[in-house]
Swiss-Prot record:
PANTHER family: PSEUDOURIDYLATE SYNTHASE TRUB1, TRNA-PSEUDOURIDINE SYNTHASE
Superkingdom of this protein's organism: Bacteria
Coiled coil: none
Keyword Coiled coil: no
Source lineage: Bacteria, Pseudomonadati, Pseudomonadota, Alphaproteobacteria, Rickettsiales
HAMAP family according to UniProt: TruB_bact (MF_01080)
Name of the protein in its database record: tRNA pseudouridine synthase B
Reactions catalysed, as given in the entry: uridine(55) in tRNA = pseudouridine(55) in tRNA
EC number: 5.4.99.25
Amino acid sequence: MSNYWLNIYKPGGISSAKLVSMVKQILGKKVKVGHAGTLDVEAEGILPIAVGEATKLIQLLIDSRKTYIFTIKFGLQTDSGDYTGTVIATKNYIPSQEEAYTVCSKFIGKVTQIPPAFSALKVNGVRAYKFAREGKEVELKPRNITIYNLKCLNFDKKNAIAIYYTECSKGTYIRTLAEDLALSLQSLGFVIELRRTQVGIFKAENAIRIKSPDEITKSFLEEKSIKIEAILDDILVLDATDSQAQQIKYGQKCIFDYEDDISLLWVRYKGTLLAIGSLNKNCFNSLRVFNVL
């Protein structure tokens, strides 16, 4: 089995790229490996890793909903939005428990967010955080995101901290959300702990934890692998005949006996993922074709 997903739990203190490198070291240098969504170095949590042909589906997973649990420290603001940064502002006001809980409703729905300067977004081909580290100002464009759920799990007035849970769309920066929450509460705040608990179908409770490539074998990862089609379970699937499979493989016109137009579906051949694409007037238009024939 060479095309699959791995549900990996990234510990804090290492980069997403480093974790991918560790997996590649275990599986072999020739194996194609990629991850579905960068996590901050100091953050921990779910980092889905695609192996082989699964890398062609990474964007679909990046587009899926994600859940996080994060802790805000009130009364201070840092340049990075988390505890690794330098304090740039302070405010004595600490919100009440009631305020910390009720503010959540203001953020549920479509929200405009300005990404933090300390982010991996590129500005003129250079990562924004590189400019930020040099003390240079970077203008990042606001982006539209969606907060599907936001709630306060715990509030500690004495230590001026609150723990929140959120379910959000792609492109959401939790550090920015935390700062905006604090500002809405007439205070300041930054993230002192961040954990991603779910990405699409991948959840923290059944994730693989890797501390060192020396302690995990290739066979162990393969045993824990998740089929490539798993992330497509809620998408329409059509079964291809031998002739249809050949047409799709070679980029030829392929007609299916299906009345509705479909913006995204996948085609299965002999029980295996063959392609993803759309259907327009019975004609299948491939977005990605997988090397399974």
